[in-house]
Amino acid sequence: IQNDDSGKGLVESLEKALGSGSLAKGDVQTYEPADPSLDTQVTNLASTNPDVVVVAATALKCGQALNAINKLGLKPKVLYISQVCSSPRLMGLVEDQAAITGVLSTTYLMPPYDPQFASDPDQLAYMEGMAKYASSVDYKNDGLYGYGWTMGAILVKTLDAAPELTRSSVMATARNLDNVDAGVVLPGVSFATAGAEDPFPIESLTMMTYDGAAKHFTLLGDLIDFEGKTTTVATRIAG
């Protein structure tokens, strides 16, 4: 994990979900953004012979972590990467694509390359908008653009719903979203918040697995609904 508040919050939440004392010394390896590689961290992690490895890195560190795992021959039963690592562009930086086939992650967005959503009205609107305003980027293959599109869409809907365009009014509206559909969220997913009691707008997602040959992820199974449950494990909430 990255050595910052986000990384620490993830570890705290994971340990809370698994149970106190579930993560022993050496189970958690941190890195600094300026670290040239993650070989040392992965070597330390390999010494614990883990069955499950969670890579909660960002940007180029995602590929560095997976390259180090492959190079050192670490073969956990489950290898999970955070959503921010699941961009095909970042996964494409891994040298041995076959070795990362089967890597797991999660999403709440429709993959832009998935044919089952090709005729979805929201997906079509995304494709049309990106073709018009950002045709030079790889929006048909990289879900990170869909994420940006979706965040913009929910912002617009929040601003439209706010009684006044003031900070307090917009924040109050954002903290009381009533199952708002926006962007390219998966069917069945919506933005819902309930003030301080439940400030998490998205609490449904699905698992997905990486296909090294196709260089993209494939969705697995149905949505997993955590509505109202995230607060039981989350330890750091932005104000």
Predicted features and spans:
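Structural recognition of the beta-strand scaffold that forms the well-ordered cores
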Residues: I1, G26-V28, V52-A57, K77-Q83, ...
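Segments of small-molecule ligand-sensing domains
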Residues: K132-Y145, V156-L219
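Sec-exported extracytoplasmic/periplasmic mature domains
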Residues: E15-L23, T43-P50, N67-L74, E95, ...
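Extracellular/periplasmic periplasmic-binding protein-like sensory domains
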Residues: I69-W149, R236-A238
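Catalytic-loop motifs flanking and including active-site residues across diverse enzymes
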Residues: L10, T58-K61, Y147-M151, E203
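Extracellular/periplasmic Venus flytrap/periplasmic-binding protein
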Residues: I1-L72
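Short hydrophobic alpha-helix segments
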Residues: V28-Q29, G221-L223
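Short, cationic low-complexity segments
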Residues: D222-G239
